[in-house]
């Protein structure tokens, strides 16, 4: 066989050290597809190097998302990446594992034994919230038509506190629902239940209770909300229902505070969503939604798909996706059991309370959430404090040590209040927390002793929150 000079050059490239390769000595195309292939080892290193200046995920205290799983879980998930979760006829045992997860959650959330609960996995709580909202809207529409209400007279509405996650705003925009927001104020840093019923009318599809507000970590008073909804339902033909956005709290509270009534034990709570990739301890992204009974999921939202080899019902918005996260969730349920989850979450709670006390002892901050309900520590600068620095400056100082701790304004009527928040996850052990506490103290010391400290009156950085 004859070889050209190009062939010889390519053969020689396999004997050239990685950083002596042609690809490492020239600029690679970044926004168009390069013409020639390259060796796997070089492609791997180039991509890895592109990511080199990003933050350390475990030091990212802004995110609720899980950043650590055991090696056995990682191997299992890597081995199942090719499985398509939607193809239940091809992968019946994967479908069975998903079904087991739904049943485990139904038991955790106290689904009534005399009702026919049902649920599904999703790519995260954002999709799960969309499904919960759609179920409420379709059920409201069906019931409104039976009552003879003119459903075209005006748009349906949804009631939620201003501490909502952005997916609810998306839901309302995508599906033509008015969002009626109950503003948080200094006396109500969660849902002001008394103000809910100032916004209710016959076009209200439901009320959302939040078990773990993204901004602060606080819980809405779901039990009080249920009592008020029940009183309303007793005197009105239009029946209100409650959906619980438990993206953060629904996989934490059952283990550390099982007596707290927030779930299907409450009569008017008809659906709950959560994020498996938060306190379910799975890598992103997997979410879950359950309905207390099949009557709360209108049949129009269940679709039969037959072109994957067998007829199967599906209710998710998303279609093709890897089953690896579902399998990771089942691994965790099997691996930890109730006591394992409880021990992990109690440890995380202990870490959060320790850090909250550390922040408070510094003397500069007023604690808004101390991590006792959900391991989120949230605080603001004390009023009347005579310092030249802000929480934004503190965030910058912490970032110099690799810690990502966001500062941001509260929503709506509290937008003049700047707070800072960090999320304690399972991988933030007590020893690492001590290191963070030391870095936190050093950051304050540096700010207090800075010779020149300049910052704008307003910070233009925007912070987003995702499920």
From Swiss-Prot:
Keywords: Decarboxylase, Lyase, Pyridoxal phosphate
PTM annotation (N6-(pyridoxal phosphate)lysine): residues: 278
Catalytic reaction(s) noted: L-glutamate + H(+) = 4-aminobutanoate + CO2
Cofactor(s) for this UniProt protein: pyridoxal 5'-phosphate
GO annotations of cellular component type: cytosol
UniProt-recorded Gene Ontology molecular function terms: aromatic-L-amino-acid decarboxylase activity; glutamate decarboxylase activity; pyridoxal phosphate binding
Entry annotated with the keyword Lyase: yes
Top EC class, one word: lyase
Lineage top rank: taxon: Bacteria
Gene3D superfamilies referenced in this protein's UniProt entry, alphabetically: 3.90.1150.160, 4.10.280.50, Type I PLP-dependent aspartate aminotransferase-like (Major domain)
Statement: the UniProt record of this protein carries the keyword Lyase: yes
UniProt-listed GO biological process terms: glutamate catabolic process
EC number, as in UniProt: 4.1.1.15
Pfam families the record matches: Pyridoxal_deC (PF00282)
Record family assignment: Belongs to the group II decarboxylase family.
Identification of the protein by name: Probable glutamate decarboxylase gamma
Species of provenance: Listeria monocytogenes serovar 1/2a (strain ATCC BAA-679 / EGD-e)
Lineage: Bacteria, Bacillati, Bacillota, Bacilli, Bacillales
């Amino acid at each position: 066989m004859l070889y050209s000079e190009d062939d010889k050059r390519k053969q020689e490239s396999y004997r050239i050290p990685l950083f002596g390769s042609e690809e490492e000595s020239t600029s690679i195309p970044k926004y168009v597809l390069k013409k020639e292939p390259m060796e796997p080892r070089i492609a791997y290193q180039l991509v890895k190097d592109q990511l080199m200046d990003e933050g350390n995920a475990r030091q990212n205290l802004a995110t609720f998302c899980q950043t650590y799983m055991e090696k056995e879980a990682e191997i299992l998930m890597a081995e199942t990446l090719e499985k398509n979760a939607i193809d239940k006829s091809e992968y019946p045992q994967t479908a069975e594992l998903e079904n087991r997860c739904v049943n485990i959650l139904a038991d955790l959330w106290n689904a009534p034994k005399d009702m026919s609960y049902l649920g599904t996995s999703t790519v995260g709580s954002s999709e799960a919230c969309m499904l919960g909202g759609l179920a409420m809207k379709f059920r409201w529409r069906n019931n409104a038509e039976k009552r003879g209400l003119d459903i075209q007279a005006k748009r349906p509405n949804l009631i939620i506190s201003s501490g909502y996650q952005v997916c609810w705003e998306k839901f309302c925009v995508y599906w033509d629902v008015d969002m009626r927001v109950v503003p948080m104020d200094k006396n109500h840093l969660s849902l002001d239940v008394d103000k809910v019923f100032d916004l209710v009318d016959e076009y209200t599809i439901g009320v959302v209770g939040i078990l773990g507000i993204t901004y602060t970590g606080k819980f809405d008073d779901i039990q009080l909300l249920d009592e008020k909804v029940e009183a309303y339902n007793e005197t009105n033909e239009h029946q209100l229902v409650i959906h619980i956005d438990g993206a953060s709290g629904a996989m934490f509270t059952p283990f550390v505070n099982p007596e707290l009534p927030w779930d299907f034990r409450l009569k008017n709570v008809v659906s709950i969503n959560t994020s498996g990739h938060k306190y379910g301890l799975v890598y992103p992204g997997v979410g879950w939604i359950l309905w207390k009974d099949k009557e709360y999921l209108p049949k129009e939202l269940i679709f039969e798909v037959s072109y994957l080899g067998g007829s199967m019902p599906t209710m998710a918005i998303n279609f093709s996706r890897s089953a690896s996260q579902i399998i990771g969730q089942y691994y965790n349920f099997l691996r930890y059991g109730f006591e394992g989850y409880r021990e992990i979450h109690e440890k995380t709670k202990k870490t959060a309370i320790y850090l909250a006390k550390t922040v408070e002892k510094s003397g500069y901050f007023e604690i808004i959430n101390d991590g006792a309900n959900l391991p989120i520590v949230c605080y603001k600068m004390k009023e009347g404090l005579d310092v030249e620095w802000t929480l934004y400056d503190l965030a910058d100082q912490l970032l110099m040590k690799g810690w990502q701790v966001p500062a941001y304004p509260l929503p709506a009527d509290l937008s003049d209040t700047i707070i800072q928040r960090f999320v304690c996850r399972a991988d933030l052990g007590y020893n690492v927390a001590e290191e963070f506490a030391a870095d936190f103290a050093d950051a304050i010391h540096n700010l207090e002793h800075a010779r020149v400290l300049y910052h704008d009156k307003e910070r233009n950085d925007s912070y987003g929150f995702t499920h």
